[in-house]
UniProtKB/Swiss-Prot annotation:
<keyword id="KW-0665">Pyrimidine biosynthesis</keyword>
<feature type="binding site">
    <location>
        <position position="409"/>
    </location>
    <ligand>
        <name>L-glutamine</name>
    </ligand>
</feature>
<dbReference type="Pfam" id="PF06418">
    <property type="entry name" value="CTP_synth_N"/>
</dbReference>
<feature type="binding site">
    <location>
        <position position="14"/>
    </location>
    <ligand>
        <name>CTP</name>
    </ligand>
</feature>
<protein>
    <recommendedName>
        <fullName>CTP synthase</fullName>
        <ecNumber>6.3.4.2</ecNumber>
    </recommendedName>
</protein>
<feature type="binding site">
    <location>
        <position position="225"/>
    </location>
    <ligand>
        <name>UTP</name>
    </ligand>
</feature>
<dbReference type="GO" id="GO:0019856">
    <property type="term" value="P:pyrimidine nucleobase biosynthetic process"/>
</dbReference>
<feature type="binding site">
    <location>
        <position position="143"/>
    </location>
    <ligand>
        <name>Mg(2+)</name>
    </ligand>
</feature>
<feature type="active site">
    <location>
        <position position="513"/>
    </location>
</feature>
<feature type="binding site">
    <location>
        <position position="72"/>
    </location>
    <ligand>
        <name>Mg(2+)</name>
    </ligand>
</feature>
<feature type="binding site">
    <location>
        <begin position="189"/>
        <end position="194"/>
    </location>
    <ligand>
        <name>CTP</name>
    </ligand>
</feature>
<dbReference type="InterPro" id="IPR004468">
    <property type="entry name" value="CTP_synthase"/>
</dbReference>
<comment type="similarity">
    <text>Belongs to the CTP synthase family.</text>
</comment>
<dbReference type="InterPro" id="IPR027417">
    <property type="entry name" value="P-loop_NTPase"/>
</dbReference>
<keyword id="KW-0479">Metal-binding</keyword>
<keyword id="KW-0460">Magnesium</keyword>
<dbReference type="InterPro" id="IPR017456">
    <property type="entry name" value="CTP_synthase_N"/>
</dbReference>
Length: 542
């Protein structure tokens, strides 16, 4: 069978949920026994999002091979079994950089290098390459970032037009659009969607399926109108209403409307019935939880919805595994009082606290005092990346007695550099793509909470950092009750730390949130939630 290609574009406005829709479609196709490969094309000129502010871009999702990618790849991972790598995300910056390097090398033999055909050819090659990451890929699902009509998106849309023409019997175009509801008029308006489709048709792309993001149910009359003016079959007008309970409703809702069957019909793919009972069970747990646990997130970017997207989702997965509902409280670390009593009052009401990764000194002390509170009050604490470094420095200052302990990231001249720059990072000039990135093997110490969670002596986790725990202080810290529970294979670098005689206080240098699924929660998030439930019951008796 020839490989099929599905292109998903967006119209009217951004942030409609193309990534979620793409992931949900990928899941449904996999349930039909198809092998799916996912690709995100981003029109921005950055080579990757690694140096972009979380306030602008949201989180940076890291793959096993060390690619810093768009957060939509996190959705792909959580919903599908698609293999994700550097080939799963391409930006304008990468594509232009590749073409310019070839021109400098003389690969174009003196030709004038242009957007068409050189840039568009490179885009098409990236699409083909994505389908070759693994053998026997049946469907390549390509999400195009941005909105129809954006100047930055034009080369990508032109490349898709050409690709669809070249593979006309093996391509499908899905357009995700917004159908607004005007409360004052009490009406749903289809005109923005009509114009969005007109933009695509003017480029030469003719959508086969229209997915309509909306706040209210669309009447048959509205769907008929969209079908008529957008020139698609009535069955191909799919409603994607705001979810009531969870984003994990999306694949179930799309399946009920038959989008997976329609895709298989249009692409002449096998169309067996599918079993979504696992996802139905997840939704049932969300609707009828045993109870509620509350986690406090103490970080720099907590007010941005997507800055810690994978962390929030992984916590939800852990709660689902226990049959509980998760409530999240967000605390901006730089605004927390540093007095212990005032801090306890400010962040009270949580069953556990998580300090996620981040860069920069802002909020550093607020995080340290949060870790101190958790250690002293025996409250569950989970530190990720910088959160582990916070835990180490707090322990060094307040337990070991190294009052000047710090990270050289914030105080290069500290007399007690408990956290220091990785040796391979010294002397680097560029910021982009130069951190320790991707999957590394970690050896776990027996009889630790980390070992109990993983039930394995060796694990693989993904990294994104420049600084590490300084082994000069290891013996001194361990004598005081600091446990190095996991180390980098072949080296003695601290990957996991625990506090002895604490119910659950763990810090990890890696990013476990990148390897958690609703159907397969990460063991550390699962056990963190369990520790929170135990703490909640000890405080409230239920």
């Amino acid at each position: 069978m020839q490989t099929k290609y599905i292109f998903i574009t967006g119209g009217v406005c951004s942030s409609l949920g193309k990534g979620l829709t793409s992931a949900a479609i990928g899941l449904l196709l996999e349930k039909k026994g198809l092998r799916v490969s996912m690709l995100k094309l981003d029109p921005y000129l950055n080579v990757d999002p690694g140096t972009m502010s979380p306030f602008q871009h949201g989180e940076v999702y890291v793959t096993d091979d060390g690619a810093e990618t768009d957060l939509d790849l996190g959705h792909y991972y959580r919903y599908t079994n698609s293999f994700l790598s550097k080939a799963s995300n391409a930006t304008s910056g990468q594509i232009y950089n590749t073409v310019i390097k070839r021109e400098r090398h003389g690969d174009y033999l003196g030709k004038t290098v242009q957007v068409i055909p050189h840039i568009t050819n490179e885009i098409k090659q990236r699409i083909v390459n994505c389908g070759k990451q693994q053998e026997n890929i049946d469907v390549v699902l390509v999400e195009i970032g941005g909105t129809a009509g954006d100047i930055e998106s034009l080369p990508f849309l032109e490349a898709i037009r050409q690709f669809t023409y070249d593979h006309r019997n093996n391509c499908l175009n899905i357009h995700l659009t917004y159908v607004p509801y005007l409360k004052a008029a009490g009406e749903v308006k289809t005109k923005p969607s009509q114009h969005s489709v007109q933009v695509l048709r003017g480029i030469g792309i003719f959508p086969d399926i229209i997915v309509c993001r909306c706040e209210v149910n669309l009447s048959d009359e509205v769907k008929d109108k969209i079908s008529l003016f957008c020139n698609v079959n009535r069955r191909a007008v799919i409603e994607e209403k705001d979810v009531e309970h969870s984003i994990y409703e999306v694949p179930l809702d799309l399946h009920k409307q038959g989008i997976d069957a329609l895709i298989c019909e249009l692409l002449h793919l096998p169309n067996p019935s599918i079993n979504l009972s696992e996802w139905e069970k997840i939704l049932e747990t969300i609707k009828n939880p045993k109870g509620t646990v509350t986690v406090g997130i103490v970080g720099k970017y907590v007010q941005h919805q997507d800055a810690y997207k994978s962390v929030f989702e992984s916590l939800t997965h852990g709660a689902l595994a226990a049959g509980y509902k998760l409530q999240i409280k967000r605390f901006e670390a730089d605004k927390l009082p540093l007095d212990d009593n005032q801090l306890a009052k400010t962040i009270e009401g949580c069953d556990g606290y998580l300090v996620p990764g981040g860069f920069g000194e802002r909020g550093w002390l607020g995080k340290i005092h949060t870790a101190k509170l958790c250690r002293e009050k025996k409250i569950p604490y989970f530190g990720i990346c910088l959160g582990m470094q916070v835990m180490a420095v707090e322990f060094a200052r307040h337990v070991v007695g190294l009052n000047e302990a710090n990270s050289t990231e914030f105080d290069p001249d500290t007399i007690h550099p408990v956290i220091s720059l990785l040796s391979e990072q010294r002397g680097l000039q560029d910021l982009g793509g130069t951190m320790r990135l991707g999957a590394y093997i970690c050896d776990l110490k027996l009889h630790t909470k980390a070992y109990q969670a993983y039930k394995s002596s060796q694990i693989s986790e993904r990294h994104r950092h420049r600084y590490e725990f300084n082994n000069t202080y290891k013996e001194q810290m361990e004598k005081a009750g600091f446990v190095v529970a996991g180390t980098l294979k072949g080296e003695n670098l601290c990957e996991i730390a625990e506090v002895k005689d604490h119910p659950w206080m763990i810090g990890v240098q890696f990013h476990p949130e990148f390897k958690s699924k609703p159907t397969d929660p990460h063991p550390l998030f699962r056990d963190f939630i369990q520790a929170m439930i135990i703490y909640h019951k000890s405080q409230h008796g239920k």
